[in-house]
Amino acid sequence: MLDFLRVTGLFFVTAVAEIVGCYLPWLVLTQGRSAWLLVPAAASLAVFAWLLTLHPSAAGRTYAAYGGVYVVVALLWLWRVDGVVPTRWDLVGGAICLAGMAIIALQPRAAS
């Protein structure tokens, strides 16, 4: 269970890195912010890619499980950064995504 919590926390940090790496260019392109924001955006996306390599599972399984956490972090971003309160549909969808992540992450592992 401790490993599951560690992986979930790592997914959370990974999602924040990805969202920041995409949000900063969005600010440049849609809000007219300084192009210098592209520098930390690129660094954040590089950190995101590196963080994905820290997971012990196969890449495809890691990406699949990560997706569930990403959805929840994006909803938290919606609420805390964009100032939009998630709807009950958002929350139910996020819970379903987390359940999917847990099913993938907690599946029995074959003995090597």
Swiss-Prot record:
Membrane-spanning intervals of the chain: 9-29, 34-54, 65-85, 91-111
Keywords, alphabetical: Cell inner membrane, Cell membrane, Membrane, Transmembrane, Transmembrane helix
Keyword Translocase: no
Record's subcellular location: Cell inner membrane
Name recorded for this polypeptide: UPF0060 membrane protein Mpe_A1656
PANTHER family, sorted: UPF0060 MEMBRANE PROTEIN YNFA
Membrane topology classification: Multi-pass membrane protein
UniProt source species: Methylibium petroleiphilum (strain ATCC BAA-1232 / LMG 22953 / PM1)
GO CC annotations, alphabetized: plasma membrane
